[in-house]
Amino acid sequence: MGSNLNPKEDKFSLLLDPLSVEDIRRHGREAYPHECCGALLGHGELVTKVLALRNTTDEGPRRRFLISPADYQAAEAEASSRGEQLVGFYHSHPDHPARPSEHDLAHAWPVLAYVIISVRKGEPGELTSWRLKEDRSAFDQMELTIGESGQETS
């Protein structure tokens, strides 16, 4: 697992390219009313590629997402082949705010970024980014910047 986001910083930030944001929004729209999920590849706070992944949960995809071990390994391999790291993941919250749930808290890993998009009645809305505290007690909201980064999407 490998982000190089600095865990000792007081303020965390993440930079997403506008095309990445559009890909996340489109994925959320297409998956609705289910949760979508995907990987964020890049360096540090810079996301250089968004990789859509399958939601493989058996627990009810309207309220949960699960990334299979094979898809996780494929995302790590893609990042490695590009000389990059797995910076984090994104997922949608259908008809709920773009805030981490208790389930998100229980299943997150420190050092990774978690982007959440709210999708209400099929329309993507608020986009937020979060990082789990080292003691796993809660999330800290990250500053999310949308700007040019020369990113690819898929």
Regions found by a protein language model. Give the residues of each.
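Conserved beta-strand-loop surface patch within small alpha/beta domains used
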Residues: 1-86, 94-154
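Conserved, mostly hydrophobic/aromatic
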Residues: 89
